[in-house]
Swiss-Prot record:
InterPro entries: Synuclein, Synuclein_alpha. This is Alpha-synuclein. Residues 20-67 are annotated as: 4 X 11 AA tandem repeats of [EGS]-K-T-K-[EQ]-[GQ]-V-X(4). Residues 99-140 are annotated as: Disordered. Its main location: cytoplasm. The modification Phosphoserine is found at S129. It comes from Rattus norvegicus. The lineage of its organism: Eukaryota, Metazoa, Chordata, Craniata, Vertebrata.
Length: 140
């Protein structure tokens, strides 16, 4: 029973770690997209640059929103997967239903994923500083 519950706990931790990596990857991709769009914008005529910068900012905002949704979705899937595995274990007689979700002392365990904050404004969403960018000055 303890081995089974520890295995489920480790599975939850793995899914949470994967979700964090996904969130970081999405944020990094948004930064790279912005860099690329700004580079192209610096090579275009004056009137287009403002539009390209606006598109880059909107892309960054949307990716941030999607990143938060991905983490929330993965967290929900992980929780349902663990619940389903526990139900299967109880149905097959591997563990007793009255022992499901209880620690060694017999008290209910706190869920890892329920208490995990999902904050789209966390550090994983910080974009690279724009110090390396320079405003476009059109040639006369």
């Amino acid at each position: 029973m303890d081995v089974f519950m520890k295995g489920l706990s480790k599975a939850k931790e793995g899914v949470v770690a994967a979700a964090e990596k996904t969130k970081q990857g999405v944020a990094e991709a948004a930064g790279k997209t912005k860099e690329g769009v700004l580079y192209v914008g610096s090579k275009t005529k004056e009137g287009v640059v403002h539009g390209v910068t606006t598109v880059a900012e909107k892309t960054k905002e949307q990716v941030t929103n999607v990143g938060g949704a991905v983490v929330t979705g993965v967290t929900a899937v992980a929780q349902k997967t663990v619940e389903g595995a526990g139900n299967i274990a109880a149905a097959t007689g591997f563990v007793k239903k009255d022992q499901m979700g209880k620690g060694e002392e017999g008290y209910p365990q706190e869920g890892i994923l329920e208490d995990m904050p999902v904050d789209p404004s966390s550090e994983a969403y910080e974009m690279p500083s724009e110090e390396g960018y320079q405003d476009y000055e059109p040639e006369a």
